[in-house]
Regions:
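A general structural detector for well-ordered alpha-helical segments in enzyme core domains, enriched
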Residues: 2, 38, 42, 65-72, ...
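N-terminal binding-site loop/beta-alpha segment at the start of enzyme catalytic domains
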Residues: 1-80, 138, 144
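A cross-family glycoside hydrolase active-site/sugar-binding cleft signature
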Residues: 16-21, 57, 83-85, 116-119, ...
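Conserved, mostly hydrophobic/aromatic
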Residues: 6, 18, 46, 54, ...
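Local beta-strand N-terminus motif with an aromatic residue
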Residues: 13, 54, 79-80, 110-113, ...
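Glycine/proline-rich, positively charged
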Residues: 26-27, 34, 91-206, 222-223, ...
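Structured C-terminal cap/extension of enzyme domains
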Residues: 47, 52, 71, 170-172, ...
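Short, electropositive alpha-helical surface patch
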Residues: 67-81, 136, 166-179, 264-270
Length: 332
């Protein structure tokens, strides 16, 4: 496994991070449960392969992810970096930040978090909730008490808002130490801000490195770009993300043991793109522009649909058929 300096946190982070929002689940008596045995196997294999960053959140996997992660890493908790998040909609009155933090600590079965993110924020929420309620001070107090080690944020907004959040936090004397943002071969809108964050000592993690699976189907794209033997677009996408010197970790939502092994192999590879190959990715972007008309990361936040429609699955089938021409794969 390759490791990278994680901003100014003092940590070394694995190039591959384990996103814990797509654990295998099963239904029993009308309720969804995480398959703990499979999760234990996947997490143990990831750890064995060198992955040291595990990212979860209170609402992942029908609110079962944090507990599942806590159980899975119990035997090596002190050797890995645990990351979770606080949804701002729970912060309505004084003390809510602390209550949410303590709830996550309890679910994860740990006495501290390595990274605690303000979850999915934008500039408006930063101003009207984080700053207005002085939640940075709550985070700083929790850090002083050893309940969290690093203050972080995940982000969904216009790229320039990243600079605003980093700068304003620093002005308050409570700097953001790491961030989690969307970044992949399909969506490079945050590329400039990744550089800004890295230049300011903020650790950087990319969510959606393969576009929610949209970049996983086979094509001849790599062969077209380089004249070399074709590789999966999935591998091309991963190498692109990990090839960015401003990016510390690619966070992958892994669902199977095979995915863990495949991703760990890619993140352990010492070979990457040459400067010329990197420049040629502009051509790749032209070919992939057709994705932009229907872009889905597979997060399933649109589920359940009131009409019972499996929206992510339909989008996935559409992509296989319309973009790749893989008719057999486009059959549910």
């Amino acid at each position: 496994m390759n490791y990278r300096k994680f901003g100014n946190t003092g940590e070394k982070i694995s190039a591959l991070g384990f996103g814990c929002m797509r654990f295998p689940e099963y239904e029993k008596d009308g309720k969804m449960y995480v398959d703990q045995d499979k999760v234990d196997e996947m997490v143990a294999e990831a750890y064995r392969q060198g992955v040291n960053y595990f990212d979860t959140a209170p609402k992942y996997c029908n609110c079962n992810s944090e507990e599942a992660v806590g159980r899975a890493v119990k035997g090596f908790r002190d050797k890995v970096l645990l990351s979770t998040k606080i949804p701002l909609d729970v912060c309505k009155k004084p003390g809510d930040y602390r209550r949410a933090l303590e709830h996550s600590l309890d679910k994860l079965g740990t006495d501290h978090l390595d990274f605690y993110h303000f979850w999915g924020i934008n500039r408006k929420e930063f101003d009207q909730t984080i700053m207005a309620q002085d939640l940075l001070a709550d985070a700083a107090k929790a850090k002083e008490e050893g309940l969290i080690r690093h203050i972080s944020f995940s982000f969904h907004d216009e790229p320039l808002a990243i600079k605003y959040i980093i700068d304003e936090s620093k002005k308050r004397g409570i700097p953001m130490e790491s961030m989690l943002v969307q970044y992949n071969l399909l969506d490079r809108t945050n590329e400039e801000m990744l550089h800004y964050a890295a230049s300011n000592g903020v650790g950087t993690v990319a969510m959606g490195p393969v576009g929610g699976g949209r970049l996983a189907a086979p094509t001849e794209l790599y062969a077209k770009l380089t004249g070399k033997k074709s590789i999966a677009t999935y591998e091309l996408a991963f190498k692109f993300v990990l090839g960015n010197p401003d990016l510390n970790c690619a966070l992958s939502g892994m669902q199977t043991l095979d995915m863990v092994k495949q991703n760990a192999k890619l993140a352990s590879d010492s070979t990457g793109f040459s400067k010329e190959e990197w420049q040629q990715l502009g051509e790749a972007m032209e070919q992939l522009k057709k994705f932009s008309e229907l872009y889905c990361t597979g997060c399933k936040y649109c589920q359940p649909c009131p009409a019972g429609i499996e929206i992510p699955k339909i989008f996935n089938m559409f992509t296989y058929y319309n973009v790749y021409g893989l008719k057999d794969h486009a059959t549910p």
